[in-house]
UniProtKB/Swiss-Prot annotation:
WD repeats, residue ranges: 38-71, 78-119, 139-175, 199-233, 239-271, 289-331, 339-373, 395-473, 517-592, 601-662, 722-782, 791-843, 848-901, 915-938
Entry-linked SUPFAM superfamilies: WD40 repeat-like (SSF50978)
Record-listed Phosphothreonine modification sites: 957
Post-translational modification: Phosphorylated by PRKCI on at least one of the following Ser residues: Ser 654, Ser-658, Ser-662, Ser-669 and Ser-672. Phosphorylation is important for appropriated cell polarization.
Gene3D superfamilies, sorted: YVTN repeat-like/Quinoprotein amine dehydrogenase
Protein name according to UniProt: Lethal(2) giant larvae protein homolog 1
Species name: Mus musculus
Amino acid sequence: MMKFRFRRQGADPQREKLKQELFAFHKTVEHGFPNQPSALAFDPELRIMAIGTRSGAVKIYGAPGVEFTGLHRDAATVTQMHFLPGQGRLLTLLDDSSLHLWEIIHHNGCAHLEEGLSFHPPSRPSFDNASFPASLTRVTVVLLVAGNTAALGTESGSIFFLDVATLALLEGQTLSPDVVLRSVPDDYRCGKALGPVESLQGHLQDPSKILIGYSRGLLVIWSQATQSVDNVFLGNQQLESLCWGRDGSSIISSHSDGSYAIWSTDTGSPPTLQPTVVTTPYGPFPCKAINKILWRSCESGDHFIIFSGGMPRASYGDRHCVSVLRAETLVTLDFTSRVIDFFTVHSTQPEDECDNPQALAVLLEEELVVLDLQTPGWPAVPAPYLAPLHSSAITCSAHVANVPSKLWARIVSAGEQQSPQPASSALSWPITGGRNLAQEPSQRGLLLTGHEDGTVRFWDASGVALRPLYKLSTAGLFQTDCEHADSLAQAVEDDWPPFRKVGCFDPYSDDPRLGIQKVALCKYTAQMVVAGTAGQVLVLELSEVPAEHAVSVANVDLLQDREGFTWKGHERLNPHTGLLPWPAGFQPRMLIQCLPPAAVTAVTLHAEWSLVAFGTSHGFGLFDYQRKSPVLARCTLHPNDSLAMEGPLSRVKSLKKSLRQSFRRIRKSRVSGKKRTPAASSKLQEANAQLAEQTCPHDLEMTPVQRRIEPRSADDSLSGVVRCLYFADTFLRDATHHGPTMWAGTNSGSVFAYALEVPAATAGGEKRPEQAVEAVLGKEVQLMHRAPVVAIAVLDGRGRPLPEPYEASRDLAQAPDMQGGHAVLIASEEQFKVFTLPKVSAKTKFKLTAHEGCRVRKVALATFASVMSEDYAETCLACLTNLGDVHVFSVPGLRPQVHYSCIRKEDISGIASCVFTRHGQGFYLISPSEFERFSLSARNITEPLCSLDISWPQNATQPRLQESPKLSQANGTRDIILAPESCEGSPSSAHSKRADTMEPPEAALSPVSIDSAASGDTMLDTTGDVTVEYVKDFLG
């Protein structure tokens, strides 16, 4: 009879087709600011901008929603980028001196980015050095000449010319240093070489003229038409940057000593010895180099000179600055990260006599800042995307789906009132190229990020562009050193140079205890809970007007006067007392301080009951914020949990203590191994396990592979950490009466279920009566394998998760089935289990042990709608493991549906930061400043759908592009993988930078729909299983 236990069911074609309509894996878009940017380019005709990174990624941005992403085949730093104006083509230079041509290609009405041709220098071993000049070893600068030719300046001083269409060298047009030296006086040569080519600049009116700057300081105007030198300027300072004047009658050069010089080009053929103007803006003391300089003319005659660097070396050599000089006005823009590059948005039409710059865009290492140059004061222009998510380090995140329009409008209004500027920019976002073809999102989604500085930021996550909406700061409630730091900063700004702080990236936190650990938002009442590192739990409410009021404070002792424990960690944050001013937005109403002040590890809010639950490494508490009184405090510490009392900053175990504990474990395991006598049930389990091994041959692959889960010791460190909290209206006392309950899961596999007595609200009233809430311990479940409990959810009689507070009462969701039997889904790090209620007897389980060492990290219930029918959807359990795999299971049957590889298992921070949404999407950090967005749903996908009006004929390169393999997008974006069965027998898709291919499915996939009669829940199978739960019933 045992052979039938392992018989594999045949695949049901109907179910497989349905799964393909429900599930599909997509990495769709990367939100945030590119990590480690290294190059910048702007196309003034198409109004698009490109950013290159050290990892070889290329990202092109236009209007909000217009994004293109690519990744070089060779992981090298992008050092320079140049658009071919109006053509949708981009030429990139990498640090290995290779050139790559990117093209925006339209397919089926939508545009995407493709890497076309590439050019590699002869130093690469795969090329024949004899066919290339020996001096073409390292390319230092690139200039596009007349749109179809590229000039390559090299380290040897030679300049080569390349045909852009084929990326082939043009024979007979190389400009060697010897040719240039013939036009230089003998006394200037002094037997020295000109040095590397430092800068190449094209003449706007006459493209055949090229301004060449050599590192030693020599400037030359070369005529490509006559193949001769028109002008020579004998500079003596080491050159850094060059720029033409608008009319070509003058040029400006910047140098390594912090000076810049203006040269006149109307002097004729004799070499020019002296510039017309030489100045050191921040002299006379030694200054750092001016790395880049721009000269922009205006009709008013007051021209702009914009440059980076040049600061006094001794006093401000560590500042990251861009200076803007116009007439007598000088502003030193002071940034908190290194300046990569900058450009101006100005008129480039040949018939215009002046540049008339509109905006200045500065790319920094950690953010992008755009300034309005037409408005007095040059204010910053709010960015609709590329906002630095990591302006302060992200510590937690959460997603809120289907945000009501009223709440959305109130949050947007609060954000608009938040930072009014005295000189508000009248300029709209200047990078407006392309058209967004995506439909307007049917529902609004909020992404909440908690940060190290005590702020919570609200982001519009409804579409491709992640737009900042509002910032909540909790630091104002507590006594910190913020005020002192602000006064010091103000004192510095009054000195010379005239510094002006620009940008929002601030990597420093005034107090690490302000860090946000957990957030929860009720979208129907606009109430919010924010919990921090020092045990602070804030209850906030959204207000549309500024207010001044005091914040109530309550302490909750989670240790309950337990003896033998002494907190050795950080102190609590001291709140301000009395009336405090609060701006429009979320304003704190209640501060709950956990004692000891350990970091909050779990929090949940039930606005309909006016209850908030919170947990730390010491226990959990329940608080009634309507009556401002605690309801419950439970200590979960094990007697050996001494590590929980040390705090995050003092967890350094001594060598003596470590050795002592190790020997104790060894001794305990030996003693327990000798003295333990196996019980009858364990003998039966061992016999069943041996019989199972004998029944199936070893070479036959058993699927699913489920290893034996070993029970953990009860004295494991930090076993009392509360991992999850959950409110539910369900059956806990008996099968006929349901009521409010609260559930808590810990690191040691314990689950506590409390029956709550919450006074019912009057008919038509929103708030409940002012009566005390009571909590009675109803059940206590101990998972015998003692794996940490990751999530808890109650399922109604139809096997669906219970609606959120107010959803059912306001007819915003289908009312739960309170007639049939409820069940509770408990997800631990090693297995999922469904228990019937109220008896808490095991009903269904799945041990996620397909790989040794696999642990559950994130779990969420999500609704997957069919791509073929709007009326059909299934609720499933989405799970992310420590191996970076995403699994989807049916609910409540826990049958595996699909399995994808999503995140590299080495990316620990990415796995820890993952957040699932209610509709089958997810976010995770691929860098400190970027979220990768992915979708598990075949229907609900958020990806760039855009087009670009380009003048270059694309059809000529289509055959060549189809012959070369398509390159994956950066970090694996926009790759589509369907359900496992649909991929069998088909060519494998391109591998991306982060693995996004799907592993083979498990053999025991459910062959039928979970709604059909044949898909009844599998009975609990304890073959070879040691995970028999111990349940205490305190209400029986």
